[in-house]
Amino acid sequence: MTMMTPPPLDQQEDEEMLVPNPDLVEGPQPMEVAQTDPAATAVENPPPEDPPSLKFTWTIPMFTRLNTRKHYSDVFVVGGYKWRILIFPKGNNVDHLSMYLDVADAANLPYGWSRYSQFSLAVVNQVNNRYSIRKETQHQFNARESDWGFTSFMPLSELYEPTRGYLVNDTVLIEAEVAVRKVLDYWSYDSKKETGFVGLKNQGATCYMNSLLQTLYHIPYFRKAVYHMPTTENDAPTASIPLALQSLFYKLQYNDTSVATKELTKSFGWDTYDSFMQHDVQELNRVLCEKLEDKMKGTVVEGTIQKLFEGHHMNYIECINVDYKSTRKESFYDLQLDVKGCKDVYASFDKYVEVERLEGDNKYHAEGHDLQDAKKGVLFIDFPPVLQLQLKRFEYDFMRDTMVKINDRYEFPLQLDLDREDGRYLSPDADKSVRNLYTLHSVLVHSGGVHGGHYYAFIRPTLSDQWYKFDDERVTKEDVKRALEEQYGGEEELPQNNPGFNNPPFKFTKYSNAYMLVYIRESDKDKIICNVDEKDIAEHLRVRLKKEQEEKEDKRKYKAQAHLFTTIKVARDDDITEQIGKNIYFDLVDHEKVRSFRIQKQTPFQQFKEEVAKEFGVPVQLQRFWIWAKRQNHTYRPNRPLSPNEELQTVGQIREASNKANNAELKLFLEIERGPDDLPIPPPEKTSEDILLFFKLYDPENAVLRYVGRLMVKSSSKPMDIVGQLNKMAGFAPDEEIELFEEIKFEPCVMCEQIDKKTSFRLCQIEDGDIICYQKPLSIEESEFRYPDVPSFLEYVQNRELVRFRTLEKPKEDEFTMELSKLHTYDDVVERVAEKLGLDDPSKLRLTSHNCYSQQPKPQPIKYRGVDHLSDMLVHYNQTSDILYYEVLDIPLPELQGLKTLKVAFHSATKDEVIIHNIRLPKQSTVGDVINELKTKVELSHQDAELRLLEVFFHKIYKIFPSTERIENINDQYWTLRAEEIPEEEKNIGPNDRLIHVYHFTKEAGQNQQVQNFGEPFFLVIHEGETLEEIKTRIQKKLHVPDEDFAKWKFASFSMGRPDYLLDTDVVYNRFQRRDVYGAWEQYLGLEHIDNAPKRAYAANQNRHAYEKPVKIYN
């Protein structure tokens, strides 16, 4: 099923945000809470069973023009249910694309509805599908979690970078594979009641940590050791790893609901970003155990980590022809086992101890015996009581220069016998009296791909037949088939529920598979699976956690009673004086920084005034309160005083009457009049003729604005009537001349207009809460001040921007900083930067904007006068940056823009080298002009050599440019432009000869066997009747491949991407049609061999989103 969605024109953004409710779920994927009809009681009908699955493709054109925060696909139906895909094109509060599967009609479904789905979401790479990013998960959808997916699906920097292949012609392709499964009753499920265990809350992407912590917790000997680590009542859990781990384990043992891990991650010294980074379980396991081992030193539990997890193996090299053997003993806490090419754990151990022969060019230099043939290998001296096996599901693919996940089937037994075949894994020094028979305790699972996914664990805490699945907050009982066989990996075929139709079976590649195994030695079982109870837990820890529980209960009550209270925020003159000119310049006050009171809604307002009297020392009868109001121009001003009748009401009644937004807050301004002795006095009576005005004073010499007070004036009076009072407030002479301006608004632009002092306030449309700014008029000399009047100063304050400038050559380093205005024109900006750099000609400056997602310069620089203002230079989609990059050109930018610069890789015919040349020519030039220019720069094999220009991408030739093609149509940002000499054999090609593409390739190991191209593609002339054997001789000579290596090469003709392997006697000519059009879909001759060539320095890495920060625990 394929859908094309038109770009949204007026799609309204939903009010609510997709963020987890901290009281419900802290899963790795945010959920959207859908409102259900409480009156409806019927449960949704069970789903029809046909079809159970569907692949849905969503094409999103004009992707970069999407201006909504959320964007939905059209609705599609799977299993009788309506679904849609939800994306956040600019990220859901992260710098990654966020993508979810959403229940399309969640708001209209009956009470208690639920559905369960296994699904994968993908962003398709439209240039090379192998680089598509796909993630898989499963979820129980319901009213409280009506969508599920991935907040950090892929970096926005990758998605929006055109060369990566995800955004082509401003179009993005998204795929969803959805299979509906049997519904589980999720929200009524009680893990503790059903299993006796509780789960761990997820901080965003910490399921990898949760699965490890559950595994360690369920090794009782380890848990007991953690409890016995010395801690004190003065330790803070957020600063002490032992105390935080003790606290976590205690809660897992005794809580009735899921446990948070924030204290523990804070004790690691992790910031929020770290907590949301998905790391590697093995890496975290090692770092955590090293930290604990270090903190256990000098305590009663010193050495516990070694006793549990440490084993030893012997590395040996033994000469074959002389009596010489070298051995080295090493310890291990876990073993890394190969998955690729191994059917099970035993095959991995066989490979681990496999003997390598050192001979030929790889002989071993034995001390006293020179170079010798030798055997090299590893054997185990002893295994630990708790054996941790890390399965190498992820590995680096050198051909693709990226990490890949291996989803091959890999089996592991319930009982692992490492004494098999007469102890073939053991060294001669091993203690043969120890029986190395192990029982499986835990299976840690990774679901997803190399770019992220979900982690959970199957554990049997007492080694009984009963398995449990620990999936973040949810713990369920599972059978052995779920814990073992379903975690082997490989492919899973979903059952066909409609046998009457001949539908092909729907296969899911099982992205969920075992990633780490924990085995416990049978002979140590009773010691490891020991009893742990309260007597193992320090008294101070029990007291602390009981107190925590009481505080948590208080918070719960606080939240439960929140609807009974309101918050009153009281602003005073003191607050305005404190804030204006320092923290804020516009309006009067930041209400987040004034005194707030939490008052029961039923409290009489008079009683609240008594609270204020105690707080501020102002008697009740001397207080007058004003209601704040948000005006249509988005300013916020005191609007009117509370009436005597209103003051007889309750706090809740006043809030409801005054607050159209119906939020929990009531904002008030407390008017306090003070006498000559600065003591409070009764406020003057206010009639309908009186208006309350606020005044700010501007000092143009020092560019300072401050609040000087307020006055009650008659609306019929004129500003000139209060000049004396204003001069007194400012500290001016009584008859000082002043200019007055009304501060009207500041969003989206500043509006500040001069007031005619001879016109009444009423005619000036001045009303309660208005702000008047005033200053002394300036002399001619003083008018040269940078901001001579109030409007210019407010304009400056609103638009000032501190811009960091960096050179394009050093895009990570700030060169200098300049304060500019967002209203500065293009010319203003380059003139100021040129002045800073001491550059005479500003037109020789070229600026480049900043990509907020990739944290790099944008690919295209800013054109000469290509933007109106500085603000246009700093905006990137919905983000605003404060960084600009600059470069100094050798010619003026307008002249340069008439030229086109192409980056051409010249492949020399005489030397094994590739040299990059930047060819700069007028845009109307042709490819022939590029070739002529290139000839002046490169060394040719002979004087009459002819050159051609090719378009190469992903190791395939897509095009030979005709010499007449204009270069303005060529884009070297997407493709590699390759120039080379035309071989003589191609010039002399006969009428029956054919010119074919020849590409190098290799096949991926494992079950997929996907073809991967690499190396430099080339053309080859083949003749009628010519066999592969004859062609091979020419290819070997052309590529200078040694006989020994060439003998291992295989040859195949490719059509539609499928190889057909050739024999030496096959006539190659017959496999290829004569065509003049070239493209990746064409036929080609494939050369299969290992890629041993070093990577070219100029080759772009096509897949860089596997970046992963290493795990660090700082404390």
Swiss-Prot record:
GO terms under cellular component: cytoplasm; cytosol; nucleus; plasmodesma
Catalytic activity: Thiol-dependent hydrolysis of ester, thioester, amide, peptide and isopeptide bonds formed by the C-terminal Gly of ubiquitin (a 76-residue protein attached to proteins as an intracellular targeting signal)
Domain MATH: 53-178
Chain intervals for the UniProt region annotation (Disordered): 1-51
Disruption phenotype: The double mutant ubp12 ubp13 roots are completely insensitive to exogenous applied hormone peptide RGF1 associated with an accelerated RGF1-induced ubiquitination and turnover of RGFR1 and are characterized by a reduced number of cortical meristem cells and disturbed PLT1 and PLT2 expression.
Entry superkingdom: Eukaryota
UniProt GO molecular function: cysteine-type deubiquitinase activity
Annotated ranges, domain USP: 198-522
GO BP: any one term: proteolysis
Keyword field: Hydrolase, Protease, Thiol protease, Ubl conjugation pathway
Main function: Recognizes and hydrolyzes the peptide bond at the C-terminal Gly of ubiquitin. Involved in the processing of poly-ubiquitin precursors as well as that of ubiquitinated proteins. Positive regulator of root meristem development that, together with UBP12, prevents the ubiquitination and turnover of RGFR1 induced by the RGF1 hormone peptide, thus influencing PLT1 and PLT2 expression.
Family as reported in the entry's similarity comment: Belongs to the peptidase C19 family.
Subunit structure: Interacts with SIC/RON3. Interacts with RGI1 and RGI2.
Entry protein name: Ubiquitin C-terminal hydrolase 13
Protein's gene: UBP13
